[in-house]
């Protein structure tokens, strides 16, 4: 049984080797680059492959080559699988697995951390200190979490964990989800619609998957519903927000500040070291220039605990498919 791991990062390699030592009957090889039409032939002779989130594959040749090579499974080292073309997957008889839950705490903790950074104006404080300005001024006056209403949009494992953390800090927590979780009724109040939540929340945090019905759910119309001076935290998917509309709301002051960890065009820069001027996306560059935006590059998942869980789950799912023809974490 053989598995080839494409796009293996230096922080993943020790975990891959650890998993391999615990599964002597499985040969796991590492290839540092993402899978492309030029290198997909390296999968020949392997039963399964593993890819990561920046490996966008929409070329029919890649899927045909995987099928001809005898590959049975594409095991994604991600929760979201929007980088995969499922019509082509199904046409070629391949199975895709994901890692639906690797560490809800990792992403939830970043969401809460960044919310607190927004409320306490940490970036502005740092700027003032770097300028030698140590005064207590109205511009730096912060807000306590216990004084606000937090709107959690999406209450799956990550959203639920975020809600619990915000509640622990004393916030009034409201939520919207198409499928409410009654187990959370003691810590939050569900609203009947997204609009109802947006009207009441001082800060919203996004934790929904990117689907046809959720794409650009935060747009000029929904932003207009929100309180003046509200905050937005997005550690979900970049496509949940219409970036241009958000920029306009930030410039007008309708939205006071935003902490963004995911972006619709993040494939242009994720996990790359770029030279000045190399990143030319005008909306990304605008966000980077705005003092009221905290910009992180899809780091929500990036903890040692989460990386180990991701690698272990991905490789174990690949083995499950190879042995049984399906897997618990199968997504097609």
Curated annotation (Swiss-Prot):
<dbReference type="GO" id="GO:0008720">
    <property type="term" value="F:D-lactate dehydrogenase activity"/>
</dbReference>
<dbReference type="Pfam" id="PF02826">
    <property type="entry name" value="2-Hacid_dh_C"/>
</dbReference>
<feature type="active site">
    <location>
        <position position="266"/>
    </location>
</feature>
<comment type="similarity">
    <text>Belongs to the D-isomer specific 2-hydroxyacid dehydrogenase family.</text>
</comment>
<dbReference type="InterPro" id="IPR006140">
    <property type="entry name" value="D-isomer_DH_NAD-bd"/>
</dbReference>
<dbReference type="InterPro" id="IPR029753">
    <property type="entry name" value="D-isomer_DH_CS"/>
</dbReference>
<feature type="active site">
    <location>
        <position position="237"/>
    </location>
</feature>
<feature type="active site" description="Proton donor">
    <location>
        <position position="298"/>
    </location>
</feature>
<dbReference type="GO" id="GO:0051287">
    <property type="term" value="F:NAD binding"/>
</dbReference>
<dbReference type="InterPro" id="IPR029752">
    <property type="entry name" value="D-isomer_DH_CS1"/>
</dbReference>
<dbReference type="InterPro" id="IPR036291">
    <property type="entry name" value="NAD(P)-bd_dom_sf"/>
</dbReference>
<keyword id="KW-0560">Oxidoreductase</keyword>
<comment type="pathway">
    <text>Amino-acid degradation; L-leucine degradation.</text>
</comment>
<comment type="subunit">
    <text>Monomer.</text>
</comment>
<dbReference type="Pfam" id="PF00389">
    <property type="entry name" value="2-Hacid_dh"/>
</dbReference>
<protein>
    <recommendedName>
        <fullName>D-2-hydroxyacid dehydrogenase (NAD(+))</fullName>
        <ecNumber>1.1.1.345</ecNumber>
    </recommendedName>
</protein>
<keyword id="KW-0520">NAD</keyword>
<comment type="function">
    <text>Involved in the reductive branch of L-leucine fermentation. Catalyzes the NADH-dependent reduction of 4-methyl-2-oxopentanoate (2-oxoisocaproate) to (R)-2-hydroxy-4-methylpentanoate ((R)-2-hydroxyisocaproate). For the reverse reaction, the enzyme accepts (R)- but not (S)-2-hydroxy-4-methylpentanoate. Can also use 2-oxopentanoate, 2-oxohexanoate and phenylpyruvate but not 2-oxoisovalerate and 2-oxobutyrate. Cannot use NADPH.</text>
</comment>
<dbReference type="InterPro" id="IPR006139">
    <property type="entry name" value="D-isomer_2_OHA_DH_cat_dom"/>
</dbReference>
């Amino acid at each position: 049984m053989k598995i080839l791991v494409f796009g293996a990062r230096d922080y993943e390699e020790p975990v891959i080797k650890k998993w391999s030592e615990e599964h002597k009957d499985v040969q796991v090889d590492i290839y540092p680059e993402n899978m492309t039409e030029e290198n997909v032939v390296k999968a020949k002779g392997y039963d399964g492959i593993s890819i990561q989130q920046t490996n966008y594959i929409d070329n029919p040749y890649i899927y045909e080559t995987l099928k001809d090579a005898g590959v049975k499974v594409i095991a994604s080292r991600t929760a979201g699988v929007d980088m995969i073309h499922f019509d082509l997957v199904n046409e070629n008889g391949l199975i895709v697995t994901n890692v639906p839950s690797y560490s809800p705490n990792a992403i939830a903790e970043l969401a809460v951390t960044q919310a607190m950074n927004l409320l306490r104006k940490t970036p502005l404080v740092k700027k003032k200190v770097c300028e030698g300005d140590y005064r207590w001024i109205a511009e730096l006056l912060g807000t306590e979490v216990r004084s606000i209403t937090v709107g959690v949009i999406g209450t799956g494992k990550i959203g639920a964990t975020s809600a619990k953390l915000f509640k622990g800090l004393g916030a009034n927590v409201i939520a919207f989800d198409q499928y409410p979780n009654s187990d959370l009724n003691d810590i939050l109040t569900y609203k009947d619609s997204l609009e109802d939540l947006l009207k009441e929340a001082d800060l919203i945090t996004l934790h929904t998957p990117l689907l046809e019905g959720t794409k650009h759910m935060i747009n000029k119309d929904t932003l207009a519903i929100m309180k003046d001076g509200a905050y937005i935290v997005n550690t979900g998917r970049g496509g949940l927000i219409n970036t241009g509309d958000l920029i306009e709301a930030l410039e007008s002051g309708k939205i006071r500040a935003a902490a963004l960890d995911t972006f619709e065009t993040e494939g242009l820069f994720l996990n790359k070291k770029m030279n000045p001027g190399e990143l030319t996306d005008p909306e990304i560059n605008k966000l980077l220039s705005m003092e009221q935006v905290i910009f992180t590059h899809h780091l929500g998942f990036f903890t040692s605990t989460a990386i180990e869980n991701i690698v272990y789950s991905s490789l174990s799912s690949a083995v499950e498919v190879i042995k049984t023809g399906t897997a618990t974490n199968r997504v097609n």
